Amino acid sequence: MKAMLNPSKSDCITILSAASELPDGKLLSLDCRSLGLSRNGMDTAARFLIERACFKRYSEGDGHYAVGSLSLQGRLRLDQLANG
């Protein structure tokens, strides 16, 4: 049984906001220091958002994540988290 991911709202907003500025076809390598997040917080939020199809593309390897521009689901989730 998978553990439930419970990321912080602010960690999700930080990752979604960074990805929202990407042009299609580009990937953003997630780095906790440049995003101002803890490693654990960033990993939890990234997995949560990837599982919910918030990005058009993503890659994962050796404990590192890279995400592409936001999918429609990602844009809706960012709006929901930021405004609601």
Segments (PLM) and residue ranges:
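Minor-groove-contacting beta-hairpin "wing" of winged helix-turn-helix DNA-binding domains
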Residues: D62-L70
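Short, amphipathic alpha-helical interaction segments positioned at domain boundaries
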Residues: S69-G84
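Short amphipathic alpha-helical interaction segments
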Residues: N6, G36-R52, Y65
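A short beta-turn/loop motif at secondary-structure boundaries
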Residues: S34, G61-D62
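Beta-hairpin "wing" of winged helix-turn-helix
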Residues: C54-E60
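Non-catalytic, well-ordered alpha-helical scaffold segments
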Residues: K9-I13, D43, L72
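Small side chains
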Residues: A19, A45-A46, G68, G74
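Short amphipathic alpha-helical interface segments
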Residues: M4-L35
